[in-house]
Amino acid sequence: MAARPGLLWLLGLALCVLGGGHLSHPPHVFPQRRLGVREPRDMQREIREVLGLPGRPRSRAPVGAAQQPASAPLFMLDLYRAMTDDSGGGTPQPHLDRADLIMSFVNIVERDRTLGYQEPHWKEFHFDLTQIPAGEAVTAAEFRIYKEPSTHPLNTTLHISMFEVVQEHSNRESDLFFLDLQTLRSGDEGWLVLDITAASDRWLLNHHKDLGLRLYVETEDGHSIDPGLAGLLGRQAPRSRQPFMVGFFRANQSPVRAPRTARPLKKKQLNQINQLPHSNKHLGILDDGHGSHGREVCRRHELYVSFRDLGWLDSVIAPQGYSAYYCAGECIYPLNSCMNSTNHATMQALVHLMKPDIIPKVCCVPTELSAISLLYYDRNNNVILRRERNMVVQACGCH
């Protein structure tokens, strides 16, 4: 469970230097120095990698996002709330437990064969899949379209069928693959959810191509109905009711990154350290309330990561920040139960007393880590919900 503790500490150190982290009662004095010209940018890039944010955060929100929320971000925000709801009282989402990454897609092209054409009538949607990360396994996929009450035809049962457009042809009908069928009444209103998971195998093989989905509406007697007349809304609908697609993915385990090599401080930098005043907003505070020798046992300390201070609120939708915590303190023999130590740590601490020049001290490290949920925009303004593992320290111990 104690995975990537070095990255978590690096995150805390970088945030405090950049002004985006707040510490309470740090137990040790750490060196401080002024950053070089490129170091803040390099640190922000490393923080993005730790959090799983792809590339540089967008410089601004999508056009019109401030005027009226769009349907996909609203739905993803509901998913985020369900994922972070500890009470279990939120709306049940059957696909959430198996997904580490959830992506929404807004249709980029919409075509209709409507009343001006021969039957059957249909509505076609296209989605850009190029932002799907390589190596992800699709656990589920849904197409969501809003239906308004329809009086044409009046009080009739409608069959809504969805197909994937496998191959288009100039001289004949496109090759289609059946995905789902839903039955409802013409007067029904609300979001219609169609299962398109069966199309996911071709996504992973051809995610450099657009995904085409075609929707048909028929009555009980097989008569084709224009989807618009049946109350199904498309791109011209209000932003909060526009159709979109959602993919649920099981992310691969993050590879273990090589630890950063600490660069030795130059003489000029050491002089700068000595000249810097201590501030309770940064690393370098010795808490006077931890014993006459300034020593405190290994425990968890507060470290808050603020996306507002990092200037990322135009990219990160939720949360505005989170408590990452960090582990610090002494692991001094005898190790008691509150130090959450292992038998090996107890033995190492004992041998260290006898041979301090040979055997190092036992380290205070995270022993239990938990995930955070992060909701953000990607480069194409698609909304992403990611469950990032091993980001919050739940417990510390001597190991």
Curated annotation (Swiss-Prot):
Its main location: secreted. GO terms for cellular component: extracellular space. Disruption phenotype: Absence of primordial germ cells, short or missing allantois. One of its GO terms (biological process) is germ cell development. One of its GO terms (molecular function) is cytokine activity. It comes from the Eukaryota. Induction: By feeding with high-fat diet and cold exposure. By beta-3-adrenergic receptor activation and thyroid hormone treatment. It is found in: Secreted. Pfam families: TGF_beta, TGFb_propeptide. Gene3D superfamilies: 2.60.120.970, Cystine-knot cytokines. Disulfide bonds join 298-364, 327-396, 331-398. SMART domains: TGFB. Glycans are attached at residues 155, 340. Expressed in testis. Expressed in decidual cells of the uterus and in trophoblast cells of the labyrinthine region of the placenta and in the inner root sheath of hair follicles of early postnatal skin. Expressed in the extraembryonic ectoderm in pregastrula and gastrula stage mouse embryos. Expressed in brown adipose tissue and brain. Keywords: Chondrogenesis, Cytokine, Developmental protein, Differentiation, Disulfide bond, Glycoprotein, Growth factor, Osteogenesis, Secreted, Signal, Spermatogenesis. InterPro entries: Cystine-knot_cytokine (IPR029034), TGF-b_C (IPR001839), TGF-b_propeptide (IPR001111), TGF-beta-rel (IPR015615), TGFb_CS (IPR017948). Residues 1-19 form the signal peptide. Residues 20-260 form a propeptide. Belongs to the TGF-beta family. Homodimer; disulfide-linked. Induces cartilage and bone formation. May be the osteoinductive factor responsible for the phenomenon of epithelial osteogenesis. Plays a role in calcium regulation and bone homeostasis. Involved in the generation of primordial germ cells; this function involves Bmp4 in a synergistic manner though separate receptor complexes seem to be involved. Required for the initiation and maintenance of spermatogenesis. Signaling protein involved in regulation of thermogenesis and energy balance. This is Bone morphogenetic protein 8B. It comes from Mus musculus. The lineage of its organism: Eukaryota, Metazoa, Chordata, Craniata, Vertebrata.
